[in-house]
Amino acid sequence: MGEEANDDKKPTTKFELERETELRFEVEASQSVQLELLTGMAEIFGTELTRNKKFTFDAGAKVAVFTWHGCSVQLSGRTEVAYVSKDTPMLLYLNTHTALEQMRRQAEKEEERGPRVMVVGPTDVGKSTVCRLLLNYAVRLGRRPTYVELDVGQGSVSIPGTMGALYIERPADVEEGFSIQAPLVYHFGSTTPGTNIKLYNKITSRLADVFNQRCEVNRRASVSGCVINTCGWVKGSGYQALVHAASAFEVDVVVVLDQERLYNELKRDLPHFVRTVLLPKSGGVVERSKDFRRECRDERIREYFYGFRGCFYPHAFNVKFSDVKIYKVGAPTIPDSCLPLGMSQEDNQLKLVPVTPGRDMVHHLLSVSTAEGTEENLSETSVAGFIVVTSVDLEHQVFTVLSPAPRPLPKNFLLIMDIRFMDLK
């Protein structure tokens, strides 16, 4: 490892990595870091690096560059931390991928469906990273797996507050992640499943149904299977939601990261044919503060409207109150004694409540439903996209929105989220 100064006054450090080691680094706030592979071969979360190409990582990025055979890399810019580690679970993750690939080959041979894998564990154990790794390795072998995102706090297939699925056709971009060309997305409306667990489980079942339908008509998708990312809530109703997801998707393999108790509970409660595997988390996994999570969510939403590093220009326009119908999924909890005869609190959680446009809508995100009419179940209908309310004019009965596409809105049914986005940058 050597340090040198370059012309841009950015500190430049060269690292020599031995086989099966990884360089871990975090980018300082308000800084960016460039990474270049000089010799050998290396990968980031399963995506191979191109030699002599500079990759840029922005503030807050936490990156691990792994090499199977040894390499030399160069970092330019200020890192909060940068070190090489020999202690990495990559071999175990590769073994998991190899076992899944064997299952795909068997499925191909026997005209059956491929493995459906669910990755579970508490918060901050690297679930999304393991999903990305397994998907990248599969797609590099010519597979076309489906990525299912059940983590409403992260929303890596779309934005936070949603659940969705993405057909993976190429490895994730080193800087941008997976190409989100045509995801299937459902509105949940909040960043924690606990706000409406009945709706959460219903959307999980809906996603599983749609995935099954796709597998019936697309042999390649069926053989390639799916990788399911889940929330870090693993107790009580959160645990029950995991069991429900495993059942809805008829999963074959559950990868449990870093929690033996959860591993034993799932082994006990899931059908005997489900293979449950306990894997360690990587030493590079960092605990994220609430503020950091909030910033990541904001950044995710900003990227939806403005594109990666601001490559899009969103549209602002007025929408008449009379042109749209706005709903919230789930009525407020009321005492059981006040509920209509034969109705339970659970029914209340799926109820569509009309929302009257008002100033309290400002900064709220709205999902634009693909539904043609309310006779369709809005909570189980996918969404076309999202808008954010920037102002409300009660006098003229219009509200102004930020939208990724120009007017008019494709449909007139909107679902309001609890999530707010302030466009301050």
UniProtKB/Swiss-Prot annotation:
<dbReference type="InterPro" id="IPR038239">
    <property type="entry name" value="Clp1_N_sf"/>
</dbReference>
<keyword id="KW-0418">Kinase</keyword>
<dbReference type="GO" id="GO:0046404">
    <property type="term" value="F:ATP-dependent polydeoxyribonucleotide 5'-hydroxyl-kinase activity"/>
</dbReference>
<keyword id="KW-0539">Nucleus</keyword>
<dbReference type="GO" id="GO:0031124">
    <property type="term" value="P:mRNA 3'-end processing"/>
</dbReference>
<protein>
    <recommendedName>
        <fullName>Polyribonucleotide 5'-hydroxyl-kinase Clp1</fullName>
        <ecNumber>2.7.1.78</ecNumber>
    </recommendedName>
</protein>
<dbReference type="GO" id="GO:0005829">
    <property type="term" value="C:cytosol"/>
</dbReference>
<keyword id="KW-0507">mRNA processing</keyword>
<feature type="binding site">
    <location>
        <position position="62"/>
    </location>
    <ligand>
        <name>ATP</name>
    </ligand>
</feature>
<keyword id="KW-0225">Disease variant</keyword>
<dbReference type="InterPro" id="IPR027417">
    <property type="entry name" value="P-loop_NTPase"/>
</dbReference>
<dbReference type="GO" id="GO:0000214">
    <property type="term" value="C:tRNA-intron endonuclease complex"/>
</dbReference>
<dbReference type="Pfam" id="PF06807">
    <property type="entry name" value="Clp1"/>
</dbReference>
<dbReference type="GO" id="GO:0070922">
    <property type="term" value="P:RISC complex assembly"/>
</dbReference>
<feature type="binding site">
    <location>
        <begin position="124"/>
        <end position="129"/>
    </location>
    <ligand>
        <name>ATP</name>
    </ligand>
</feature>
<dbReference type="Pfam" id="PF16575">
    <property type="entry name" value="CLP1_P"/>
</dbReference>
<dbReference type="GO" id="GO:0005634">
    <property type="term" value="C:nucleus"/>
</dbReference>
<dbReference type="GO" id="GO:0005524">
    <property type="term" value="F:ATP binding"/>
</dbReference>
<comment type="similarity">
    <text>Belongs to the Clp1 family. Clp1 subfamily.</text>
</comment>
<dbReference type="InterPro" id="IPR032324">
    <property type="entry name" value="Clp1_N"/>
</dbReference>
<dbReference type="GO" id="GO:0021695">
    <property type="term" value="P:cerebellar cortex development"/>
</dbReference>
<dbReference type="Pfam" id="PF16573">
    <property type="entry name" value="CLP1_N"/>
</dbReference>
<dbReference type="InterPro" id="IPR038238">
    <property type="entry name" value="Clp1_C_sf"/>
</dbReference>
<dbReference type="InterPro" id="IPR045116">
    <property type="entry name" value="Clp1/Grc3"/>
</dbReference>
<keyword id="KW-0067">ATP-binding</keyword>
<keyword id="KW-0464">Manganese</keyword>
<comment type="subunit">
    <text>Component of the tRNA splicing endonuclease complex, composed of CLP1, TSEN2, TSEN15, TSEN34 and TSEN54. Component of pre-mRNA cleavage complex II (CF-II). Also associates with numerous components of the pre-mRNA cleavage complex I (CF-I/CFIm), including NUDT21, CPSF2, CPSF3, CPSF6 and CPSF7. Interacts with CSTF2 and SYMPK.</text>
</comment>
<dbReference type="InterPro" id="IPR032319">
    <property type="entry name" value="CLP1_P"/>
</dbReference>
<feature type="binding site">
    <location>
        <position position="22"/>
    </location>
    <ligand>
        <name>ATP</name>
    </ligand>
</feature>
<dbReference type="GO" id="GO:0006388">
    <property type="term" value="P:tRNA splicing, via endonucleolytic cleavage and ligation"/>
</dbReference>
<keyword id="KW-0808">Transferase</keyword>
<keyword id="KW-0547">Nucleotide-binding</keyword>
<comment type="function">
    <text>Polynucleotide kinase that can phosphorylate the 5'-hydroxyl groups of double-stranded RNA (dsRNA), single-stranded RNA (ssRNA), double-stranded DNA (dsDNA) and double-stranded DNA:RNA hybrids. dsRNA is phosphorylated more efficiently than dsDNA, and the RNA component of a DNA:RNA hybrid is phosphorylated more efficiently than the DNA component. Plays a key role in both tRNA splicing and mRNA 3'-end formation.</text>
</comment>
<dbReference type="GO" id="GO:0051731">
    <property type="term" value="F:polynucleotide 5'-hydroxyl-kinase activity"/>
</dbReference>
<dbReference type="InterPro" id="IPR010655">
    <property type="entry name" value="Clp1_C"/>
</dbReference>
<dbReference type="GO" id="GO:0051736">
    <property type="term" value="F:ATP-dependent polyribonucleotide 5'-hydroxyl-kinase activity"/>
</dbReference>
<dbReference type="GO" id="GO:0005849">
    <property type="term" value="C:mRNA cleavage factor complex"/>
</dbReference>
<keyword id="KW-0819">tRNA processing</keyword>
<dbReference type="InterPro" id="IPR028606">
    <property type="entry name" value="Clp1"/>
</dbReference>
<dbReference type="GO" id="GO:0098795">
    <property type="term" value="P:global gene silencing by mRNA cleavage"/>
</dbReference>
<dbReference type="GO" id="GO:0005654">
    <property type="term" value="C:nucleoplasm"/>
</dbReference>
<keyword id="KW-0523">Neurodegeneration</keyword>
